[in-house]
């Protein structure tokens, strides 16, 4: 049987949205998280070290405009006609006084060649006043709100110190989608003690980022691993490829998949270190999907047909 496609690709999604090439530029806008500052806990998520995904230009001593201009110079060398999405990535980018949060978004949007924004945040940090503003913003520019889901299991969410429940995720995702806003999610595969669950497929998300469990220096999870390594299963690249295929076969076929792995700096990464760049991993994943006769939604679509 011929396989019509393997998965719904993020690059294709962007090509449908824009008539030109676009690149996300990460921003550190000086936010924090409610599970870091004592409102809901201390220390943040047990797996998190924001240094793993902040480029060198993402420093809070620089303004949002300065960070974007540095990012534009970096990416624009290869594609002079490229446009950009301001990616509010570090920490919780809706957490703060609403007027101040809005000011930061508006600063990004007046930078030349910025054609939209992507906002990374938590499902328990979307006040209605801010969602009302974002509803209007969505009418005048490209907007995606990305929620850190990480797990659908409340026990796991407690263990990793997220400070919210999956029910809160469901409620906030639906509010955001009902407002007409493109809505993304992040999920971690391989968290300790967790079984695979496709509840995330029931959420009306536009896009999903999947990434592997990584042990990062300076995190509470790295300390837990040092004390109890038997509680963790660190996947080989081939094992993780099989896990990802099993997972995405059960996802909705129209859910845009932005990535399957994340990369951390070598000096911060404890394990697993596969020695693969993201594109190399993706090519191996595609090859294995073809070998298995697998595609996104294969089992999810079958379940829908039998209901």
Where are these regions (language model features)?
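Auxiliary Fe-S-binding modules of radical SAM enzymes
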Residues: 2-12, 16-23, 207, 215-307
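Hydrophobic faces of well-ordered beta-strands that scaffold small-molecule active sites
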Residues: 23-27, 84-86, 117-119, 143-147, ...
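Core AdoMet radical
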Residues: 51-71, 79-98, 112-126, 142-169, ...
């Amino acid at each position: 049987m011929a396989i019509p496609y393997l998965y719904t690709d993020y690059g294709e999604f962007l090509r449908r949205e824009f008539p030109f090439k676009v690149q996300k530029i990460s921003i550190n806008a000086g936010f924090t998280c409610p599970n870091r500052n004592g409102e809901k806990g201390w220390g943040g998520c047990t797996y998190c070290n924001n240094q793993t995904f902040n480029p060198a230009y993402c420093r809070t001593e620089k303004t949002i405009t300065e960070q974007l201009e540095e990012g534009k110079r970096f990416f624009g060398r290869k594609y002079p006609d490229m446009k950009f999405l301001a990616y509010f990535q570090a920490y919780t980018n809706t957490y703060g006084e609403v007027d101040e949060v809005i000011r930061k978004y508006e600063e990004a949007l007046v930078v030349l060649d910025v054609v939209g924004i992507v906002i990374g945040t938590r499902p328990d940090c979307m006040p209605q006043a801010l969602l009302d503003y974002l509803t209007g913003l969505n009418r005048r520019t490209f907007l995606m709100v990305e929620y850190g889901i990480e797990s659908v299991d409340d026990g796991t969410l407690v263990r990793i110190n997220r400070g919210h429940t999956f029910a809160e995720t469901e409620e906030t995702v639906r509010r955001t989608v009902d407002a007409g806003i493109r809505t993304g999610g992040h999920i971690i595969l391989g968290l300790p003690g967790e079984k695979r669950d496709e509840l995330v497929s029931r959420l009306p998300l536009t896009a999903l980022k999947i990434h592997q469990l990584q042990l990062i220096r300076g995190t509470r999870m790295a300390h837990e691993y040092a004390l109890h390594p038997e509680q963790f299963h660190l996947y080989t690249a081939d094992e993780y490829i099989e896990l990802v295929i099993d997972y995405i076969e059960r996802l909705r076929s129209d859910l845009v998949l932005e990535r399957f792995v994340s990369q951390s700096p070598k000096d911060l990464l404890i394990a697993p270190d596969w020695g693969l760049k993201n594109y190399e991993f993706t090519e191996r994943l595609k090859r294995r999907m073809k070998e298995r006769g697998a595609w996104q939604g294969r089992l999810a679509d079958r379940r829908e047909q039998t209901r």
